[in-house]
């Protein structure tokens, strides 16, 4: 589980936009780039190679 306080200081590594946390999938979502970054053992994996592309339905 992610410490929600991190959302105030982290940003998407590609566009520097705000990320939102999706608890049920344990991912950080960038709505601008349509990417989902996994949170592994409470640590956000903010690497493009770890991200998956998401559809607008998943956002």
Swiss-Prot record:
A cellular component annotation (GO) from this entry: cytosol
InterPro entries: Trm112-like
One Pfam family from the record: Trm112p
Gene3D superfamilies: 2.20.25.10
Family: Belongs to the UPF0434 family.
UniProt name for this protein: UPF0434 protein Ping_0902
């Amino acid at each position: 589980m992610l410490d929600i306080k991190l959302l105030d200081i982290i940003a998407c590594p590609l566009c520097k936009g705000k990320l939102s946390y999706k608890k049920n999938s344990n991912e950080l979502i960038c709505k601008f780039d349509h990417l989902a970054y996994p949170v592994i053992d409470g640590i956000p994996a903010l690497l493009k190679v770890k991200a998956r592309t998401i559809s607008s339905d998943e956002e």
